[in-house]
Amino acid sequence: MKKVIVTGGTGFVAGWVIVEFLKAGYEVSTSVRSMKKTDRLEKEIAGAVSKEEMGNLSFFEADLTSDKNWVENIKGADGVIHVASPMGNGTQSVEELVTVAKNGTLTVLNAAKKAGVKRVVMTSSQAASTPESNSTETLDESFWTDINNPDLDPYRISKVESERAAWKFAEENDLELTTILPGAIFGPILSDKAVSSNGVLLRLLNGMPMTPHVPLEISDVRDLAHLHRLAFENPQAIGKRYLAASQTLTMAEIEKVYQTNFPYKKIKIRQAPNWTLKIAARFVPELRALVPMLDRKYHHTTVAAENDLGWTQHKPEDTVLDAAKMLIKLGVDK
């Protein structure tokens, strides 16, 4: 049985990556910052896999800010799926967040090298492949974000710098690296404690007074987890970046999906002037990342993942609907 290490097990994406690999017959060991969090994580994962598959999951305590416990726990694995990354809280400086993100990535990659594990699949972000907001381009994996772009927030800059650092380290140390670049990650949550990026959908589901014109390139978390496994298993993916979102819905279009499927919510769709989002983003952290996306016209292509790996995606309408159904089922929408 092959074994993979998944970093940041308590995260929204990492949880689904764990489920994906367990269901495919892998042994999975995942890092958590505190072993006190394993009870909750076990319950989340157990709800999505069989009892037999659950027996192949283990945990170890490790933090991206420290070298402690990484090497000995990675040793003997067939590969590392590096998902963990700091999101930031909107208050850090560029330097602070970039340093934490880069150092965390290099901590894991250096531990993999010392443990003799060459294969690494890393979660990056479309933030590392973003043009200026007025661009109308169709972008593929060859495009890298210009960190001098004034539209970029510290989080986006940190994703660019940490991915570049990963590629540099991989080239210098003969690691077999693949990076995955998702867009706005939505989909069913595994528990009411893991809302994560679905917080945006929760606001739309509960009705926003006005909706900014923000087109979102959507990555279904289930498809994203599947892409990590496909990339890990396919030697053709070594040395490549893969974009993981190409289908777009505006926030108003998401509201329309909810208006149709949940009429009792009495959702009203009102377009907001751009300046209202800019003001609201000062007080609501999850809205800050949306400001550079106002009225954007550029988009990405996922042809590489489709052609190389046979990857497919849910329709974005199904993604946001499935996410909402789970939010409602778990009572998070109240």
What are these regions (language model features)?
Residues 172-175, 187-198, 230-241:
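Glycine/proline-rich active-site loop of Rossmann-fold NAD(P)-dependent oxidoreductases
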Residues 4-26, 31:
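N-terminal Rossmann NAD(P)H-binding glycine-rich loop of SDR-like oxidoreductase domains
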Residues 91-154:
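Conserved Rossmann-fold NAD(P)-dependent oxidoreductase catalytic core, especially the SDR/UDP-sugar
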Residues 227-286, 316-334:
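Mid/C-terminal beta-alpha module of Rossmann-like enzyme folds, strongest
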Residues 46-103:
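NAD(P)H-binding glycine-rich loop region in Rossmannoid oxidoreductase-like domains
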Residues 201-209, 214-242, 247:
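Alpha-helical substrate-binding/gating segment
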Residues 280-312:
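Conserved C-terminal active-site "lid" loop/helix of NAD(P)H-dependent oxidoreductases
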Residues 150-177:
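Active-site Tyr-X1-5-Lys
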